[in-house]
UniProtKB/Swiss-Prot annotation:
Catalytic activity line of the entry: uridine(38/39/40) in tRNA = pseudouridine(38/39/40) in tRNA
Protein name: tRNA pseudouridine synthase A
GO biological process: tRNA pseudouridine synthesis
Organism listed in the record: Streptococcus pneumoniae (strain ATCC BAA-255 / R6)
Annotated function: Formation of pseudouridine at positions 38, 39 and 40 in the anticodon stem and loop of transfer RNAs.
Length: 249
């Protein structure tokens, strides 16, 4: 068998998530169906580096799969790209070692979360940015977001009941910028891994701080007490993008 690593992007609006679902459309299943057709009906299994939720988008998701033959990488990329649904784009494909695993090989991820604070909202962006039409103090959020950088136990920012035992993660970058129109905010988070709904919970908390309904120091309290009830609401998924996955050499 020959193992390939692919970088893909997708519009998450019409997907129930990346991971295969029993009764709903998923990115994994669509790519597996295309690869199985290319492999003359023999089943191909796709593995993903990240499991994005329903409605979450990806600019740089990484997958791997095995084929029973070797094929020119660009020809394979072109075939997989053109025969996959239009809301999936295959950016690149490369041959990798047989023991490479996109999920378990050491890597870091970067996510972006886009907020539309326009009044009225931009209807063309309704599936691609989370609308928040309330007053926001950007400077307060920029101070608060920096408190998330570093190595912390992020129990207070993960979904209640998550099965992961070790909730310590390292965030190497946490930043917030505003576009030139002032309408769109982009939150960026880079780190060695993120817990279930962690980013959406962090953004929901930061928006509450920006709206002056929480103090900036609430971030410190959430990290110290590890209590989800102290954090803000979970932001909607439509503003979240898996931007990039970087592997160590």
């Amino acid at each position: 068998m020959t193992r390939y690593k692919a970088t893909i992007s997708y519009d998450g609006y019409a997907f129930a998530g990346f991971q295969r679902q029993s009764h709903a459309r998923s990115v994994q299943e669509e790519i597996e169906k295309t690869l199985t057709r290319l492999n003359k009906g023999q089943t191909i299994t796709v593995h993903g580096a990240g499991r994005t939720d329903s409605g979450v988008h990806a600019l740089g998701q990484v997958i791997h799969f095995d084929l029973p033959y070797q094929m020119d990488e660009e020809k394979l990329r072109f075939a997989l790209d053109t025969q996959s649904p239009e809301d999936i784009d295959v950016i690149s494909i490369e041959l990798v070692a047989d023991d490479f695993h996109c999920r378990y090989a050491k890597h870091s991820k970067t996510y972006e979360f886009i907020v539309d604070r326009g009044r009225p909202k931009n209807p063309m962006r309704r599936h691609y940015a989370t609308h928040f039409p309330y007053p926001l103090d950007v400077e307060r959020m920029q101070i608060a977001i920096k408190k998330l950088e570093g190595t912390h136990d992020f129990t207070g920012f993960t979904a209640s009941g998550t099965s992961v035992e070790d909730k310590v993660r390292t965030i190497t970058e946490a930043s917030l910028i505003v576009d030139e129109t002032g309408q769109f905010l982009t939150f960026t988070f880079s780190g060695n891994g993120f817990l279930y709904k962690q980013i959406r919970n962090m953004v929901g908390t930061l928006l509450k701080i920006g709206n002056n309904r929480m103090p900036v120091e609430q971030i410190d309290l959430i990290l110290e007490k590890k209590d989800r009830q102290l954090a803000g609401p979970t932001a909607a998924p439509n503003g979240l993008y898996l931007k990039e996955i970087r592997y160590e050499e």
